[in-house]
Amino acid sequence: MPKPNVETFVDLLERSGLVDKDQLTDALIEANKATEGRAQDDVDLLAEQLVSRGLITRWQADRLLEGRYKGFFLKQYKLLSQLGRGGMSAVYLAEHVLMHRRVAIKILPKDRVADSSYLARFHREAQAAAALDHRNIVRAYDVDQDNGQHFMV
């Protein structure tokens, strides 16, 4: 998909739910002031302004610039950036929407869910991680699914 223009980018951002309408309106005004009006015609400049103001992350901006507006939320968590990807899953930095606690979320790809052995292995991993309690081992807080997307916090 070609890079969106400014109008399409703003529409994608609204549809994503990452920024509320008032925040977006204020950010657009400020971005145009800061760039002497250039942000209204340059989608990359607008995205950079939103990132520098902390309204979206670089990873979120890149996804929006690819024309994507879905996949930024898993239940009560907002995905901020991808930390890594392996053969079985991907790990993201996320933030709890209400508590603003940053966590790592391991997500099992939807195509792996169809294979019951992968899902069972994912659940066993979550149970094993939850049973461990040591200062040098990452603690597992939750395992859940959202519209068929299985994840561990």
What label would you give each PLM region?
Residues L13, G67-V153:
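Conserved ATP-binding/catalytic core of the eukaryotic-like protein kinase fold
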